[in-house]
Amino acid sequence: MSDKPHELISVIMPAYNEGSCIYENIYETIRVLSDAGYRYEVIVVNDGSTDNTLEEMERAVNEMGCLKIVNCRVNGGKGHAVKTGFRKASGDLVVFLDADLDLHPGQIQNLINILKEKRVDVVTGSKRHPQSQLNYPLFRTFLSNIYAFIIWILFRLPLRDTQTGIKLFKYEVLKKVFPKILCKKYAFDLEILVNAHHLGYKIAEVPIVLHFRRPMNWGRISLVDMSALGVDTLAIFYRMHITHYYDKIAS
């Protein structure tokens, strides 16, 4: 448990067409945080879903409370959804958690423990940590490893994985970094971590347990998405190392 029981934990959960699992993930997140004795708020962001995601969020509010709903009428991407949710956050610590239950919210506790023990500012889950347990398609693992190598070449981050959907930040880190962020979709995580590292914040990785739940090996990542991720990644490099855009934007 946190050594500061008064600390508030904000969990931001962006969701796009997650009607089949969003209620269960909200329930599990609230249960985990309640059992651990934390003060918390859960902020769920409906990112323009076309299924029953919003209705399931509203059902959770009616039955559980401790929940804020943000409804984006148009699908703007994960990055846009998280930034929108952050505007509603008031926690001392902020968790990003994917809504699909591939990563059980019970792992939040480990991220908080590591942040306290190692006295860092950011903790990220890592699929490439040697202690991680993965039930993950081989082709997705292959792509993830290639992307991680490219990131290391371009940015020399002290991380093996930037894209896993569970992360913990001190509030002040995001307050400083978010004004600089331009990516709205999959490279959003990378852009945050690159800027946090550039500003001198300490980052640690933790092993995760991942159970890939989608029926298709590709999941939702299409060739178009991968191409967009590549373009955005190069754009981050360009802004960081060529134009020094991020240094010109006040935090």
Regions found by a protein language model. Name each.
Residues N25, T53, V82, G106-I108, ...:
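Acidic donor-diphosphate engagement hotspot in glycosyltransferases and nucleotidyltransferases
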